[in-house]
């Protein structure tokens, strides 16, 4: 895993008055910087500067050796998204995009595959859905462009949806952050101007009958309710949600708009940034308190707190050491995680989070693994009030904002990673933002999508490092992300499927691990069946798909005398899958 980036705040302050590439931009009401005079006045040839022979200056933040890119055993594909007609259509109304965010002749996306993981059948048919937006340092036109992208694992754009003008039906989304899945082909978008449903296959866009905060929005089929944070005036002003609750799936009714509404609502001013639900319980991720709260939606009482000063658990690190949770003052270096994003309930006792590992002033916190942000999966025993880190992966980036850690059917985690500094001449650290797949078994990166951009002050300079944010003293968070960013991402598969087939109980049954097309808030109904050689149903069994793609095996009885058949699966949206099985050659279960 290695030792990772140090904190660079002191370096930034020293360089503030120098006319060099390391510029931290200070914005005030009296002095607004604009890029209108900093147009790219160069040809593609001038952009293609050499990356050889570059030495880091002593004042430049230097990334330590932590190889995550195309070395031995990796294959890389470069993609020019700006040549894709679907992407171009989302940008035609954004006149500043070519001067600030993109160059039409330069590829902006590199996709890496671990060579032995490039042909994995159904796992390679995954679609990644995310919001990619570019932000300038001009506060008067901060959001330059942005779009929702559905992309396959080879970097091909399946579909794209603009944040602004050009969206279907004349709708305007505004910048989107939280993305989750409604069904196999439809994403839920938590955007500035409301909640939306987007079918990435048909391109259809539907506005939901309410406005929620942009951090998080999920849907539960069991009760036809959306769950998210409220978008009241104070929340929008501070970009810090003041509460969370349920929104009626038909009317959008909620307790913030109507206190008499019988649905669930909960007020909290600790900067909530993610919400998951399971049964009668809600799990609220409090960035401000570095905590996950479990709340009984029937009584609105907190059941427990996991992490932070008020933690009810003994928490053990990845090496078995207990963290000191009996803290009487803010001590980020002693917390298990700091200012996390997407702290979520996975089921079966498991939880995951993206540990941004930042303290006061967005400074990275020194920890045993360095100062890097990291992916974390926990196993929690509620009865004994103990929790264990079972997976910890430092990303190699100091991600002061954003991020997630989602389990995948492959056993990998899907994560996004914001960077604080960009190093254009370093193949590993040249990207503004990354989407990763990391193996929970080996801690190795098995897939990566890295998105490139430009220095906002000197876009023709492709050599010198530059900050991926500017400092705004009027902003509560201070450090404001700039240029290309991704808040989080989600995954979808076109069909359900099973992995790890084996012969159980001496050949009397087939054991398999079923996976739904998307992640859901509660376990979702499914059916398994066996088809004989004539295509007739020989056996059938209902079951529930594990909601977060945890590996939970099922078994189905094999009728006596049936040796060759198809194992089939289906879900509530009719996305069937089948595979031939021969009991004579099927490996016995361990």
Task: For each feature predicted by the language model, list its residue ranges.
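A positional/structural detector of protein chain ends, strongest at the extreme C-terminus
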Residues: 1-4, 590
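N-terminal signal-anchor transmembrane helix specifying type II single-pass membrane topology
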Residues: 3-32
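Histidine-/acidic-rich catalytic cores in large beta-rich domains
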Residues: 29, 36-590
